[in-house]
């Protein structure tokens, strides 16, 4: 895990090394000052020698300036290194997520990924900054202070050493318990983020069903849960300060008592006693800082593990060696295909799918909920890989193609239509970033989207809000179809992508496809038989298996499931979503 994270320090190695070096120099300068003060008191002030007092005073000023300068540089470089490290982690996670296959994405919740790229990275950033600066400064201060205490007076230093051991042991047990609590706290952040994301993305539904109070209570409960867990963890950590202060004051009292006796006995000077007070205070403060560092590290350990999971996740689907860079045509063949979302689980979504589709054919796909319609389409563009058998496009196994080439030539309009914030043209050019405005207009004409776009005041420069919230469902579907058409694909898959348009527009879109892209293989997944009855062939899926694969007329004669759907839709003049397999 640590190796994975440190690999993203990259160009920030230099400030990451300079920061602890400056921190070490800062400790040297700061810890030299009490020793100089002791000499100033003993050899200058008490001896009445102003020349010596001036000399040590100037030396103390020089050391203070050097300590201030190196401390400033340590802070500057630590901030630069940690901020750059965090930026690289976010970029690394984002880049790796872009390579994920659908099967990889299925392992994580959206809220979980958002938490990793925000809260978790911030935790690691803060911990890294503490480690390369404070985690160097604090232990060096303890070591240097203890060394100087032994130089000044070994007898009193034994007392300090015992105090340090007692304090360190106490802090160890406190931090050990606190770490467990903090680790659990940050796992709960996913639930909070999921609640926020779900509520904001579905705010219109929340308001439509007047569920504001329910959602507020749900969020309050999640926030209160995290608050209580934090309080529980902090109740453990708060013992830090009283234990720390007790030991410091105990050391001060003992130092004052024994120091006074040693001064009277002539074995210790006033200046040396003053320096011992400074060193013991610096030592104890550094130990307290170390305890805070341990808290920060414990809080960030869980975050680091979660970040590492995303960074080390390998894409299940990658390009083959020497991939094919051209799809010859739109012919498709499923050769006894078996598929499940969890390989080896035995829960097959598709079972023994065996069929051939000629280039340029129009294929309808119909079936009940969970019958495998979308899974069937996803295999063609290799969004998932088959468990057994093979899927070929253009006469070649889809696993032999370059992924970008294959997905450019097999355009899919997914069941969930997503538009991004930007103009209509910006959204259309997701299909082809080099498309001219004329090509975009032509694609919209083919998708019957031009008729409503022309009614907008800004036409193709109309701004689309995030998620397409300012256009209707049918308008969104037609824009997504136009976006796919700009790819000029060999295969076009519409996954229930005209469900929100009226039947007349649906018919116009199908007619436009026949006239403008006759050579493109078109696979239309639908619930309405009217959307696919004119297809060359219709695939009927039931429980992940082929129930029928023929023309509309033939299926009416030979397939009971298809005939039942048709009869119900003819009778009710509506859609019928029969219950299918898992």
PLM regions: where:
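Transmembrane helix-loop-helix hairpins at lipid-water interfaces of multipass membrane proteins
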Residues: 16-73, 77, 150-155, 266-270
């Amino acid at each position: 895990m640590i190796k994975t994270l440190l690999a993203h320090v990259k160009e920030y190695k230099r400030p990451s090394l300079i920061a602890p070096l400056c921190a070490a120099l800062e400790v040297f300068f700061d810890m030299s000052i009490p020793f100089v003060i002791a000499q100033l008191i003993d050899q200058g002030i008490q001896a009445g020698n102003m020349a010596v007092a001036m000399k040590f005073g100037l030396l103390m000023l020089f050391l203070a300036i050097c300590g201030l300068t190196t401390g400033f540089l340590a802070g500057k470089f630590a901030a630069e290194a940690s901020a750059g490290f965090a930026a690289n982690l976010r970029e690394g996670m984002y880049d790796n997520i872009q390579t994920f296959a659908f099967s990889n994405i299925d392992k994580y919740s959206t809220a979980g990924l958002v938490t990793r790229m925000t809260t978790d990275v911030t935790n690691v950033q803060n911990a890294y900054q503490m480690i390369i600066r404070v985690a160097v400064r604090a232990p060096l201060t303890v070591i240097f202070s203890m060394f100087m205490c032994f130089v000044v007076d070994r007898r009193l230093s034994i007392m300090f050493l015992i105090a340090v051991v007692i304090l360190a042991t106490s802090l160890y047990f406190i931090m050990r318990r606190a770490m467990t609590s903090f680790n659990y706290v940050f796992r709960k952040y996913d639930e909070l983020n999921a609640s926020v994301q779900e509520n904001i993305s579905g705010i219109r539904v929340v308001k439509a069903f007047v569920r504001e109070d329910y959602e507020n209570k749900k969020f309050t409960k999640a926030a209160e849960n995290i608050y209580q867990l934090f309080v529980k963890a902090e109740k453990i950590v708060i013992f830090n300060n009283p234990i720390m202060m007790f030991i410091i004051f105990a050391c001060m009292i003992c130092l004052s008592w024994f120091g006074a006796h040693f001064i009277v006995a002539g074995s210790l000077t006033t200046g040396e006693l003053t320096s011992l007070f400074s060193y013991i205070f610096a030592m104890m403060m550094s130990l307290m800082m170390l305890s805070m560092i341990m808290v920060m590290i414990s809080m960030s350990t869980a975050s680091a593990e979660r970040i590492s999971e995303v960074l080390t996740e390998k894409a299940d689907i990658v390009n083959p060696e020497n991939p094919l860079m051209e799809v010859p045509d739109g012919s498709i063949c499923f050769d006894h295909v078996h598929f499940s979302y969890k390989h080896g689980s035995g829960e097959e979504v598709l079972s023994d799918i065996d069929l051939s589709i000629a280039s340029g054919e129009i294929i309808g796909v119909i079936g009940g909920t969970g019958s495998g319609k979308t899974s069937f389409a996803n295999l063609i563009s290799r969004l998932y890989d088959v468990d057994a058998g093979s899927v070929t496009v253009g006469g070649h196994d889809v696993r032999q193609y370059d992924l970008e080439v294959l997905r450019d030539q097999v355009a899919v309009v997914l069941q969930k239509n997503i538009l991004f914030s930007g103009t209509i043209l910006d959204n259309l050019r997701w299909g082809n970033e080099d498309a001219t405005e004329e090509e975009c207009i032509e694609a919209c004409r083919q998708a019957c989207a031009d008729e409503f776009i022309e009614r907008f005041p800004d036409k193709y420069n109309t701004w689309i809000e995030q998620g397409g919230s300012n256009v209707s469902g049918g308008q969104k579907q037609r824009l997504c179809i136009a976006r796919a058409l700009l790819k000029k694909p060999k295969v076009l898959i519409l996954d229930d992508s005209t469900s929100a348009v009226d039947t007349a527009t649906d018919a116009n879109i199908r007619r436009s496809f026949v006239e403008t892209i006759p050579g493109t293989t078109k696979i239309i997944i639908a619930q309405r038989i009217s959307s696919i009855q004119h297809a060359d062939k219709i695939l009927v899926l039931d429980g992940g298996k082929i129930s029928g694969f023929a023309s509309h007329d033939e299926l009416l004669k030979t397939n009971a499931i298809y005939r039942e759907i048709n009869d119900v839709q003819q009778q009710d003049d509506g859609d019928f979503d029969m219950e299918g397999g898992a």
